[in-house]
């Protein structure tokens, strides 16, 4: 189990190498930019008894993780039904377009926004979010019954996570054995996060000041 999502810049393949650099003693794990969660999931498996505090500024993604932790059965039930009602690429395209409209609807429950986010993530090119377009191939291979079935196991795994939607600096600590992992968005040509990439731009400007400014 690596991650329930397809996420740009995700570290699922790099996790084994990253873990080679872990300190000998860790009493708490914190992650400022959760994203696809590969590193936090690995740390939970390696250190099942330590506190895990993860943070995500992008609201739809934060709500997905929150719903996965607290309402995994609901996500599973809704997504299974939607997949069964939209088995072909034509109907999946309309499901994707509807989900894109729902991801940022404040009037919806956080659970239904999480359902919408998962659909957009799984049915788009490269796991992009609201700035993405529909991928027929992804709607078959990634928005799958098998992937939805796995959500229950992920829900159990992260049941003790503390999940927040805060400024990344809130997770900083002076305690020597608190391990903070920070992997902010990359500066790339494509806008990856949020509506038309606005979240991606904001994150870059906010979290990546020039060394000359320090």
What residue ranges belong to the model's regions?
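Gly/Ser/Thr-rich active-site loops/lids in small-molecule metabolic enzymes
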Residues: 199-205
